A protein has these predicted regions:
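Basic/polar, cationic surfaces and motifs that engage anionic cell-wall
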Residues: 1-12, 45-54, 62-127
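Secreted/periplasmic proteins that engage bacterial cell-wall peptidoglycan
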Residues: 3-55
Length: 127
């Protein structure tokens, strides 16, 4: 088994009130020249977790923009609960992972529109 040490959280940059399904996100990534969706997991607003790419661990939640299109933490309670459950499971499988946001690797990005390190830095202690 390969050793995973980093989990990157993304947002889809989808305004509140606009739906971007897993299939829509996949189609958009392929249209932009990717071979497949760019994420390992995609969490829709209802908290449903969809599996995407198999060769990396990037988690994307549907949202990240307010109704004006401004970057904002738009996670629903269902998305927050699903993200915690998913991160706990990934931590169980890959105990050495560090959870970061996309902007922690590229400061030019707002994504995921919240401070993932502050929120999930104590991953083993998540409640």
């Amino acid at each position: 088994m390969r050793i995973i040490t980093l989990v990157i959280i993304h947002c889809s940059a989808t305004p509140q009130g606009v739906r971007l399904s897993f299939d829509d996100c996949r189609r958009e990534h392929i249209r932009r020249g990717f071979s497949d969706i760019g994420y390992h997991f995609y969490i829709t607003r209802n908290g449903e977790i969809h599996r995407g790419r198999r060769h990396s661990i990037g988690i994307c939640y549907e949202g990240g923009l307010d109704i004006r299109g401004t970057p904002a933490d738009t996670r629903t309670p269902a998305q927050r609960a699903s993200l915690v459950a998913l991160l706990r499971e990934l931590k169980r499988i890959f105990p050495k992972i560090l959870v970061v946001g996309h902007h922690d690797l590229n400061p030019m990005k707002e994504c995921p529109c919240f401070n993932a390190v502050a929120e999930y830095g104590g991953l083993p202690k998540l409640k």
